[in-house]
Amino acid sequence: MLVRTALRLIFGSQHERDLKNLLPLLNAVNAQESWVLPLQESEFKQKTAEFKARAAAGEALDAFLPQAFALAREAARRVLGERPYDVQILGSLVLHHGKIVEMKTGEGKTLMSVAAAYLNSLSGRGVHIVTVNDYLAERDARWMRPVYDYLGVSVGVILSSMGSQERRCAYACDITYGTNNELGFDYLRDNMQFLTEEKTQRDFYFAIIDEIDSILIDEARTPLIISGPAENDTQHYAEVDRLVGQLQEVERNPATGDYPNEVDGEEVRGDYIVDEKNRKVSFSGPGMLHIQDVLTHAGLIQGSLFDEENFKYIHYFTQALRAHLLYRADVDYVVKDGQVQIVDEFTGRILEGRRYSDGLHQAIEAKEHIRIAQRNRTMATITFQNFFRMYKKLSGMTGTADTEALELNKIYKLEVVVLPTNLPVARVDEHDVVYLSEEEKWSAICDEIKEAHTRGQPVLVGTISIEKSEKLSALLRTRGVKHEVLNAKNHAREALIIAEAGAKGSVTIATNMAGRGTDIKLGGNPEFRARQSATAIASKHGSSSVTVQEHMQACYEAEYTRWRADYEEVKQLGGLYVIGTERHESRRIDNQLRGRSGRQGDPGRSKFFLSLDDDLMRIFGGERLKRFMSRVGMEPGEPITHSWLNKSIERAQTKVEARNFDVRKHLLEYDDVLNEQRSFIYAQRAQILIDEHVVERVYTTIEEYLNREITALRQELKRRGRLSLGAFQQNLSTLFDYALGGEDASGWNETRLGTLKQEILAHLKKNIESKYLLAGAQNMDTFIRYQYVQAIDKKWLDHLELLEILRESVYLRSYGQKNPLTEYKLEGFDLFYTMLDDIRLSIASQVVRVTVHMEEQRVPRPPHVAQAAHEFQALGQPGRGHGSLSALPIQAGAKVGRNTPCPCGSGKKYKHCCGR
């Protein structure tokens, strides 16, 4: 420790060294200012065209970086009236070099990204600026578009409401704003298209991720899923929900609070064990037998619970218990309009259309006694971890990344560089105060809020759930404190509430959704007030939005004058007072809450009020602390404040962060297996769509198949001295309608086997060539492509299910002293190679056996999988590693009957062709 401190004193911190290395580039940018100032607007566009031409000719972007950055800075000054500070230019240099910038709230991250985005757009390969929601994507694109227009680069924005053509145009722009969800779903949908021209995205070159910690860490365990309807087993969830109350939790040791160890032979009383930290439930031996008795008595099963047809009920009981014990209404989800809507644990926002995966959502619907929706089947999936690792260069910005620097470096190979604030941070972060009980804590918080409100200091209170925010709201109402509540239930008023959160005397209770991407200004927000005034004036006279803009300037001048006085008064009162009502699992989330106060050198204050009943304290040693504090004579209502307590809490948070990192890393190791397979299958699919000689793939497959079979026959001949052609003949007949004839094989040798292979291959090639003559090369190529794509899509869905089953069961291999991950990799790739062989051989078989009719036929477009990829309904849930974000394709067109002719044109019944 002393050595590290000494080295830091001598050489500076890593962040200081990183910034020092960039100073020559910053000086070079500043030196270009005299060159750029006299330029006319048209010359900016000329320079952009010149730089694009140089980049297209192979020149590195760094060759004209100083000039490009100087152009971007001057364009921002002329268009927005804001000249990026040197620290913002430093931040843009960090982004350009593929690193993460940590920049405090209110320091201008949106403007900082302009120079890096402009420079990299000159490559002609597209830059993606990624935000967490549509509102921020649209706002930032609208705000920065005039700057980019001045420079002569095009800007697009991807919104969830857009169709395919709009998306295609937006992705073709030099710079594209969009959300992480939309970019990920577009990637999956593109790989479900039948025609290359229907794809929307280009290759992944450079991305700048806003709030990068939220996307790459908080949502890292969130798989994006496009899904379709699966087996309808909704009645089982309702049946089990009625029975689950008959089960009892295993009794704990009253002295330690621990469960008995069944493996060591300790007596177990009860049916299930709850793992609150990991949100899991497991059953005891007696519990399994009790479930069997309950199901038998209810008439739902016959025989043993462990029979193949009954084993599924263990899954239904597991999810029912998780729904009742580990997922709470108004904390993890809300019930609205007859639907269970997920609440993001990190932002407090409702995650529109998302659903918990693996049947958990259905179990919660059964618990809440609302309509249970049918489960879905995964059709395409990718995690954010693997999606963003596809970019050639990745960077990002946030106010809180340094605490997660290790994870960001290990998983994404991204370094974090902390930028100094333009003005020193004047916020005072006080020690936590801890109370024995939750009720004592709430009482103290209310007293603190009322005191600050009385003197006029604005207060922002952060809560971890809707339930807690509404509880505090009720307590404040009884004390007569006027306040606003911002949570997922009233998120529509977010802009209004946040705009006034810094006004004199305001009290705002908010879940974590408060203000990521927005600033809380002391004294209120003059722009927002001016727009409200201008809108009111215009509507009073029945005027249009054009008239609103005409009134804006006058209204803004009046509001700005009032705001300056309010701002100075609130500064004198100490600025925004941030109160935390509970520590989060991650220090980073706590820092985000603190960061709402003290923007751009403003004064501020932050303080956390805790109790030993809080989740973090209770799970990580709260009972022991409570006994200790009682022994030292703490009186009810008396708080404890000490630096060692803060360190103890931070140690608990560090443990949780390390555990969550291990979980994400472990999941990534498993997902990397799927990612490698997905990359290969998508690449093959894309190549098939553009392959002008697709029939050669069929010829290769047939030849490889014959080589394998003939090799096996040669080995048999060597081993036995004679041949048995029965199985080979049966396979040829089944696959290719080919008969060997009646030749006696008793005298065959290896030479005859070689000529046999050539005879069969020549016959099958002639068969296919005759179809090309009859149907035409274009029609046959289209038919083969269609068969390939359909087979890939169908087999890939089956393969995803097999991998999921393997992943859920492979952990049992550890009991046999085997590494589950190694076993998963080995068996996963065995399944994958088997799938590839099945696809290739099934296509070769179909092409050989298809009948070509001498009439005009149009090969149809693929069925609903590809067509519906344009339209989807979002489903699925992120968070805690148990959810997924999904999109559900909508089936379009009439369903093909199993006994009707197959639409592919083979002449066979659908059930004997593509419907197999």
Curated annotation (Swiss-Prot):
InterPro entries in the record: Helicase_ATP-bd (IPR014001), P-loop_NTPase (IPR027417), SEC_C_motif (IPR004027), SecA (IPR000185), SecA_CS (IPR020937), SecA_DEAD (IPR011115), SecA_motor_DEAD (IPR014018), SecA_preprotein_X-link_dom (IPR011130)
Catalytic reaction equation(s): ATP + H2O + cellular proteinSide 1 = ADP + phosphate + cellular proteinSide 2
Biological process per Gene Ontology, one example term: protein transport by the Sec complex
UniProt EC number: 7.4.2.8
Cellular component annotations (GO), alphabetically ordered: cell envelope Sec protein transport complex; cytosol; plasma membrane
Cofactor note: May bind 1 zinc ion per subunit.
Pfam families linked to this entry: P-loop_SecA, SEC-C, SecA_DEAD, SecA_PP_bind, SecA_SW
UniProt enzyme class: translocase
Keyword Transmembrane: no
Molecular functions (GO terms): ATP binding; metal ion binding; protein-exporting ATPase activity
Lipid bilayer topology: Peripheral membrane protein
PROSITE patterns registered for this protein in UniProt: SECA, SECA_MOTOR_DEAD
Cofactor(s), by name: Zn(2+)
Keywords, alphabetical: ATP-binding, Cell inner membrane, Cell membrane, Cytoplasm, Membrane, Metal-binding, Nucleotide-binding, Protein transport, Translocase, Translocation, Transport, Zinc
Protein localization: Cell inner membrane; Cytoplasm
Binding residues for Zn(2+): 902, 904, 913-914
Residues at which ATP binds: 88, 106-110, 519
Highest taxon listed in the record's lineage: Bacteria
SUPFAM superfamilies attached to this UniProt entry: Helical scaffold and wing domains of SecA (SSF81886), P-loop containing nucleoside triphosphate hydrolases (SSF52540), Pre-protein crosslinking domain of SecA (SSF81767)
Subunit (UniProt): Monomer and homodimer. Part of the essential Sec protein translocation apparatus which comprises SecA, SecYEG and auxiliary proteins SecDF. Other proteins may also be involved.
Function: Part of the Sec protein translocase complex. Interacts with the SecYEG preprotein conducting channel. Has a central role in coupling the hydrolysis of ATP to the transfer of proteins into and across the cell membrane, serving as an ATP-driven molecular motor driving the stepwise translocation of polypeptide chains across the membrane.
UniProt record similarity statement: Belongs to the SecA family.
Stated name of the protein: Protein translocase subunit SecA
Protein encoded by which gene: secA
